[in-house]
């Protein structure tokens, strides 16, 4: 990241024509994101209602499950009602048909026969309350679904009683579902609940990602690492065509081209594969695309993720030479709003994949876009090294469990204490990033290994096991 000298880039990204992709979000967050109700108004003074899932999300709901799973929904209103309010929820495949037609996607419906709507599909809001009890949507595996494919549970919501209105975006809901029955589960559970997710951000110019397989927990054999971030692809600008595009150096491209060898073994153990996106010393970057440019770039991101079966992106606003005057068409003055716009457009283009932000520079805090809080379209926010403050005001609507605290930089020996890591976990912050882990480096035994042993104890009350395998960089 900001301490790494990035190599010169030499190769264009390959043409991306494949389709498909891997699902990426988790339904097991422990702390519900808070929704800012101030933006939900009708303009005529009447009460507005909105539907959120158990993580406080209104925009998209993503879930992975094994054998069976469920998602809860709540009705909230901007004011108390004088009579009981009800909303009916039904499985309606036309919702998916409309979505596929609008966005040019080809998602398939999750079998209706395997979906159960609790309470007869009725959400009830008692008189004098602004928050309903939960409606649970449950689903089971029938053995027919492909594990590497996303399916949709399409729902339609309708007000059946009560003096309030549902916004248009709250009248339908797509649940993006991935059936992982029979596949390894990378999630580490502590006291029956999902524990900390470890994000391993690797500068792959000299490090083999297979090293993430070498570290497991003694009690269950699960990998210490939950997610690999490939650092990094680049955001570049072609002055002749006026196009912003993704540019991979020879090392990133080698891993993508040989994903069966370097990346799929991690996914087979349950890990996610995320591609970093970073500026590259020209006028383009995370924080200065116009709406139209961001929308076009988001489609390129989707094509790349489809082609290489990636699980999402990691945005990092560094190394861009932004224009602050005489700004080129297609760009805007750099700032937090265009950075948020890029994240929003990428999430809209591929809602089943993660958008992760490095909470640094312009992405240290992101505003709402088109009425949606940044915690709706950014799945995880990972602090800069050592950062430990709550990110709720920086990413409104994001669950605490998706905020990464006390990030560590192993190359320079910037590590976290066991007490800080344990405090993080105990306070519900369940995401953590390590950068530049590589057992082939000279500081492995006395810095990296010790740091990961502290992580195993603090996060999981467990012991770290190193299998002794050190994978070298073995591609040209």
Where are these regions (language model features)?
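Sec-dependent N-terminal signal peptides
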Residues: 12-20
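Bacterial N-terminal signal peptides that target proteins for export
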Residues: 2-13
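Secreted glycan hydrolases and related glycan-binding modules that recognize and/or cleave
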Residues: 27-85, 93-114, 118, 124-138, ...
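C-terminal motif of bacterial Sec signal peptides marking the signal peptidase cleavage site
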Residues: 21-25
């Amino acid at each position: 990241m900001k301490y790494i000298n990035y190599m010169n880039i030499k190769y264009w990204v390959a043409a991306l024509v494949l389709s498909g992709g891997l699902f990426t979000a988790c339904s097991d967050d422990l702390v519900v994101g808070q929704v800012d109700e101030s933006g939900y108004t009708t303009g005529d003074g009447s009460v507005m209602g909105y539907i959120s899932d158990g993580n406080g999300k209104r925009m998209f709901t993503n879930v992975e499950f094994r054998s069976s799973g469920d998602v809860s929904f709540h009705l909230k209103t901007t004011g108390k009602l004088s009579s009981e309010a009800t909303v009916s929820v039904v499985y309606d495949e036309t919702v998916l048909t409309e979505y596929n037609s609008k966005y040019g996607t080809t998602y398939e419906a999750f079998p209706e026969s395997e979906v159960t709507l609790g309470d007869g599909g009725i959400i009830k809001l008692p008189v004098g309350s602004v928050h309903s009890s939960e409606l649970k949507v449950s689903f089971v595996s029938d053995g027919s679904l492909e594990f590497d494919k996303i399916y949709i549970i399409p729902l339609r919501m309708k007000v059946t009683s009560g003096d309030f209105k549902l916004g248009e975006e709250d009248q339908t809901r797509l649940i993006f579902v991935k059936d992982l029955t029979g596949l390894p589960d990378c999630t580490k559970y502590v006291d029956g609940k999902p524990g900390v997710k470890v994000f391993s951000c690797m500068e792959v110019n000299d490090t083999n990602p297979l090293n993430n397989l070498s570290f497991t927990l003694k009690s269950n054999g699960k990998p210490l690492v939950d997610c690999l971030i490939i650092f990094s692809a680049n955001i570049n600008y072609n002055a002749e065509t006026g196009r912003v595009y993704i540019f991979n150096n020879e090392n990133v491209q080698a891993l993508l081209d040989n994903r069966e060898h370097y990346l799929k073994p991690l996914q087979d153990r349950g890990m996610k594969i995320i591609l970093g996106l970073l500026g590259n010393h020209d006028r383009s970057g995370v924080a200065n695309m116009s709406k139209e440019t961001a929308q076009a770039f988001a489609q390129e991101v989707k094509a790349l993720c489809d082609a290489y079966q990636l699980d999402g992106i990691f945005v990092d606003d560094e190394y861009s030479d932004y224009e602050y005057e005489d700004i080129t068409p297609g760009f805007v003055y750099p700032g937090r709003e265009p950075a948020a716009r890029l994240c929003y457009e990428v999430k809209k283009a591929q809602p089943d994949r993660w958008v992760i932000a490095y909470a640094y520079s312009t992405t240290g805090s992101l505003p709402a876009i088109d009425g949606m809080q940044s915690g709706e379209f950014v799945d995880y926010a990972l602090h800069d090294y050592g950062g430990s403050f709550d990110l709720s005001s920086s990413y409104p609507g994001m669950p605490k469990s998706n905020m990464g605290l006390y990030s560590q930089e192993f190359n320079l020996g910037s590590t976290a204490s066991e007490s800080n890591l344990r405090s993080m976990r105990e306070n519900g912050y369940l995401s953590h990033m390590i950068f530049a882990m590589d057992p082939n480096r000279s500081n492995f035994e006395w810095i990296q290994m010790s740091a990961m042993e502290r992580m195993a104890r603090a996060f999981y009350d467990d012991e770290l096991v190193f299998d002794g395998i050190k994978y070298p960089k073995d591609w040209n």
